[in-house]
Structure formats: structure tokens, C-alpha cells
Curated annotation (Swiss-Prot):
<dbReference type="InterPro" id="IPR035940">
    <property type="entry name" value="CAP_sf"/>
</dbReference>
<keyword id="KW-0568">Pathogenesis-related protein</keyword>
<keyword id="KW-0873">Pyrrolidone carboxylic acid</keyword>
<protein>
    <recommendedName>
        <fullName>Basic form of pathogenesis-related protein 1</fullName>
    </recommendedName>
</protein>
<dbReference type="Pfam" id="PF00188">
    <property type="entry name" value="CAP"/>
</dbReference>
<dbReference type="InterPro" id="IPR014044">
    <property type="entry name" value="CAP_dom"/>
</dbReference>
<dbReference type="InterPro" id="IPR001283">
    <property type="entry name" value="CRISP-related"/>
</dbReference>
<dbReference type="InterPro" id="IPR002413">
    <property type="entry name" value="V5_allergen-like"/>
</dbReference>
<dbReference type="InterPro" id="IPR018244">
    <property type="entry name" value="Allrgn_V5/Tpx1_CS"/>
</dbReference>
<feature type="signal peptide">
    <location>
        <begin position="1"/>
        <end position="23"/>
    </location>
</feature>
<comment type="function">
    <text>Probably involved in the defense reaction of plants against pathogens.</text>
</comment>
<dbReference type="GO" id="GO:0019953">
    <property type="term" value="P:sexual reproduction"/>
</dbReference>
<feature type="modified residue" description="Pyrrolidone carboxylic acid">
    <location>
        <position position="24"/>
    </location>
</feature>
<dbReference type="GO" id="GO:0006952">
    <property type="term" value="P:defense response"/>
</dbReference>
<comment type="similarity">
    <text>Belongs to the CRISP family.</text>
</comment>
<dbReference type="GO" id="GO:0005615">
    <property type="term" value="C:extracellular space"/>
</dbReference>
<keyword id="KW-1015">Disulfide bond</keyword>
Length: 177
């Protein structure tokens, strides 16, 4: 009876671990922090888009061999993140949202650091989201989120008044991350 109890306990533990690892990377795990950041600046929520998620998964699968922080150059807005030894949905979105401190609304520019990932998260016209996560061959985790319509258009603010002020060239949009 002890052996059977041990087998059952191991199976339950394994099932919980599998469930919790998937639970940390579900569509809602990507949407919730995106929508929380958007809510803070008065922007409406995003919805999950399976077409974007499939696009993201296809591209993430291409990065398994190298975990390269290289944009897909597709038709969507895109944020990338990679980390070792662990990275989940909430962690990736937190990295992007933490760039908020570098975004200066008055000048519509990044001051003291990169903020283009943050501005894409809160871009008012981006209303559909799809993300994917893979573990690369070197053990790093790679996450990509795609946004439709894309954001980060020069001369436009991510949120707020539709009356735009001139673009400040200090806005550093990511080219390789």
C-alpha cells in the first residue's frame, strides 16, 4: 500500500507542476498585466487573438536554436524578451512595463533609457494581442508578443490626447531587442 501511495503522490505532484507551469503562461497571464498597465494610463483593454498567438508561436519556434533577440519584421507590433534560467508571461510583461520610468509624456520621448517596449504595451490603437514562449536549446526562455494594429509610430503618442505634439528624436525604439 505504501508503494501505491507514493506513486499516486508523485503523479499528483507532477500534474500540479505541469498545470502551474502552463498557468503561468496562459493567454490571461499575458493579457492581465498588459491590461493593468493600459488601465493606469486610461487605455482600453486588449483581447487575445489566436491568429497573433499562432504567428508568435511560429516565430518563437524559429528562435529555439539560438534564442536570438531578433525581430520578425512582420506586419505586427512586437516585443521580445529572453532570460535564464526562467521567464514567464508576467516576468516578460513586467520587464516591458518597467520601462515606463523612461517615458516622458510631455516630450513624447524616452529619457535615460529605452521605453519602446512600454509604449507598445500601452499603445491605444493596439487592441489585439498574441504571445508565445519557448525554451531554447541553450536553456534560455524566449517570449514574443505581437500587437495588432502595431504601435510606436513616430510623431504619435501611445495614449492620451489625440492632438499630437511634434516627435522628439530622443525616443529610442528597439531595433534589436
Amino acid at each position: 500500500m505504501g508503494f501505491l501511495t507514493t506513486i499516486v503522490a508523485c503523479f499528483i505532484t507532477f500534474a500540479i507542476l505541469i498545470h502551474s507551469s502552463k498557468a503561468q503562461n496562459s493567454p490571461q497571464d499575458y493579457l492581465n498585466p498588459h491590461n493593468a498597465a493600459r488601465r493606469q494610463v486610461g487605455v482600453g483593454p486588449m483581447t487575445w487573438d489566436n491568429r497573433l498567438a499562432a504567428y508568435a508561436q511560429n516565430y518563437a519556434n524559429q528562435r529555439i536554436g539560438d534564442c536570438g533577440m531578433i525581430h520578425s519584421h512582420g506586419p505586427y507590433g512586437e516585443n521580445l524578451a529572453a532570460a535564464f534560467p526562467q521567464l514567464n508571461a508576467a516576468g516578460a510583461v513586467k520587464m516591458w512595463v518597467d520601462e515606463k520610468r523612461f517615458y516622458d509624456y510631455n516630450s513624447n520621448s524616452c529619457v535615460g533609457g529605452v521605453c519602446g517596449h512600454y509604449t507598445q504595451v500601452v499603445w491605444r490603437n493596439s487592441v489585439r494581442l498574441g504571445c508565445a514562449r519557448v525554451r531554447s536549446n541553450n536553456g534560455w526562455f524566449f517570449i514574443t508578443c505581437n500587437y495588432d494594429p502595431p504601435g510606436n509610430f513616430i510623431g504619435q503618442r501611445p495614449f492620451g490626447d489625440l492632438e499630437e505634439q511634434p516627435f522628439d528624436s530622443k525616443l529610442e525604439l528597439p531595433t534589436d531587442v
